[in-house]
Amino acid sequence: MKLNYVGIVISRAMPKTAKVRVAKEKFHPVVKKYVTQYQNYMVQDDLNCNVGDAVTIQPCRPRSATKRFEIIKILSTANRMSPASEISKE
């Protein structure tokens, strides 16, 4: 059984590669509160997602020296406006 993670795409600087940030909540025993910890993963992006998209990733065979995950589904897309549409509204 493969573990699936849900995260947000934070970078698309390279072709077919995206950087995804996954948030995990961990209980801190001293302060007795839940603390959010973030882990960034380099993932194989065959679905051509954009920055800000919520995606599901799962482990796969090593694709490169740093890529060990792949995007299997885009859960929601980011609400981004193009610069031309912003200028026309003003």
UniProtKB/Swiss-Prot annotation:
UniProt KW keywords: Mitochondrion, Ribonucleoprotein, Ribosomal protein, RNA-binding, rRNA-binding
Keyword RNA-binding: yes
Gene, per the UniProt record: mrps17
Functional description taken from the UniProt entry: Component of the mitochondrial ribosome (mitoribosome), a dedicated translation machinery responsible for the synthesis of mitochondrial genome-encoded proteins, including at least some of the essential transmembrane subunits of the mitochondrial respiratory chain. The mitoribosomes are attached to the mitochondrial inner membrane and translation products are cotranslationally integrated into the membrane. uS17m may have a meiosis-specific role as it accumulates during the middle stage of sporulation.
Domain of life: Eukaryota
Compartment list: Mitochondrion
Family to which the UniProt record says this protein belongs: Belongs to the universal ribosomal protein uS17 family.
Name of the protein described by the UniProt record: Small ribosomal subunit protein uS17m
